[in-house]
A protein has these predicted regions:
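A short acidic, amphipathic alpha-helical/loop segment
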Residues: 83-84, 109-113, 172-176, 228-232
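Short, hinge-like loop/turn segments at secondary-structure boundaries
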Residues: 112-116, 138-142, 178-180, 202-205
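Terminal accessory/targeting
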Residues: 1-70, 82, 86-96, 208-256
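Divalent metal-coordination and catalytic microenvironments
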Residues: 73, 88, 97, 121, ...
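Short, solvent-exposed loop/turn segments at secondary-structure boundaries
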Residues: 133-138, 196-198
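His/Asp/Glu-enriched short active-site or ligand-binding loop at hydrolase and phosphoryl-transfer sites
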Residues: 160, 168-170, 174-209, 241-252
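A cross-domain feature marking catalytic cores of carbohydrate-active enzymes
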Residues: 72-74, 99-101, 123-125, 164-166, ...
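Active-site beta->alpha N-cap acidic-glycine motif
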Residues: 42-135, 142-153, 157-158, 242, ...
C-alpha cells in the first residue's frame, strides 16, 4: 500500500459513505471516524520509513545468507565517533556513516579518516533541521546538495545514498530524491540507542532482532553506542552473522 493507492481507496470509501449516508443516514460521527483513520494512516506512512508509503526506500536485503550492515547517523561527533572508528578498526568491520553536512565543518580530518579506513559516507542532509520534512522540495534539494558539495570538497566523493532526517518521508521528500538522483536508505532494525540508557537492554534489543540482510540503525552521537559496540560486534558474530558494508551488501555504487 502506497500513498497513491491509499488516496484512491479513500476517495472510493468516502463516495460509498456519502451514498450510505443518503440512503441510511449514517450520521456525522462516521465522517469523523473516516477523517481520523485517514490522518492516522498518513502519519504512520510518514513516520515508518519501512512502509514505503510515500517513497520506496531500501530497508533490508532479501537473502538467506547471515550478514547485516551497520549504519551510524548524525555524526561525525568528535571523540565519540573516533572511539567508534577505533572499535570498528580493531574488529575489521566496515560501516556506513550517514553524516550531517554542518557537522563536517571543522571535522574534515575525521571524515577523511572514515574514508581511509574503508567506511562509506551517506547523506543525512546538511542541516538536519527539525522541520526538514516541512521544507519545500526545492529547499530540501538545496540542503542535500549542500551536504554533497561539502563532502566532495573534503573527500572527493559525493554521496548517492540518502537517509531522511528522523526517517520521515512525504511527497516532497520523494520529489527531492528523484530530482537529485539519490537512493533512499532506511533500516530494518532501529536500535533506539538515543533513547535506551541501559546497556544490557540495548544489546538484547538489537541482538534479538537480527535477521539476514538487515540494516541496523545506530548513532555515533550516542555515548552508550560506543560503550556497547565491542560486545555488540561479538554478539553478532557469535550468532553466525557477518557484517559487511552497506553498499557492498546492496551491490550499488554509493557515490556519484
Amino acid at each position: 500500500l502506497n500513498n497513491r493507492i491509499f488516496n484512491i481507496i479513500s476517495i472510493g470509501l468516502i463516495l460509498c459513505w456519502i451514498w450510505a449516508d443518503r440512503h441510511f443516514q449514517v450520521g456525522a460521527p462516521a465522517y469523523g471516524w473516516l477523517l481520523l483513520i485517514y490522518v492516522s494512516v498518513i502519519f504512520c506512512g510518514s513516520y515508518f520509513i519501512r512502509w514505503d508509503f510515500f517513497l520506496k526506500s531500501i530497508c533490508s536485503v532479501k537473502t538467506n545468507e547471515k550478514y547485516i550492515a551497520l549504519s551510524f547517523d548524525d555524526g561525525p561527533a568528535g571523540i565519540k565517533t573516533k572511539k567508534i572508528l577505533e572499535i570498528l578498526k580493531e574488529n575489521n568491520v566496515e560501516a556506513a556513516f550517514f553524516c550531517i553536512g554542518k557537522n563536517l565543518l571543522g571535522q574534515e580530518e575525521l571524515l577523511k579518516t572514515m574514508i581511509q579506513e574503508g567506511h562509506m559516507i551517506g547523506n543525512h542532509s546538511f542541516s538536519h533541521h527539525y522541520l526538514f520534512d516541512l521544507f519545500s522540495s526545492r529547499k530540501m534539494l538545496d540542503d542535500l546538495q549542500h551536504m554533497s558539495r561539502v563532502c566532495k570538497d573534503i573527500t572527493g566523493v559525493s554521496p548517492r545514498f540518502f537517509r531522511p532526517p528522523y526517517g520521515v518521508t512525504n511527497p516532497n521528500v520523494k520529489k527531492t530524491v528523484l530530482r537529485g538522483g539519490f537512493i533512499a536508505i532506511g533500516w530494518s532494525i532501529r536500535s533506539y540507542d538515543t533513547v535506551i540508557r541501559n546497556e544490557e537492554r540495548l544489546l538484547k534489543k538489537i541482538l534479538s532482532s537480527l535477521k539476514p540482510g538487515a540494516i541496523l540503525l545506530l548513532h555515533d552521537t550516542s555515548e552508550i553506542t560506543a560503550n556497547v559496540l565491542p560486545r555488540l560486534l561479538s554478539g553478532v558474530r557469535d550468532r553466525g552473522y557477518r557484517m559487511i558494508r552497506l553498499d557492498k551488501m546492496l551491490n550499488l555504487n554509493p557515490y556519484d
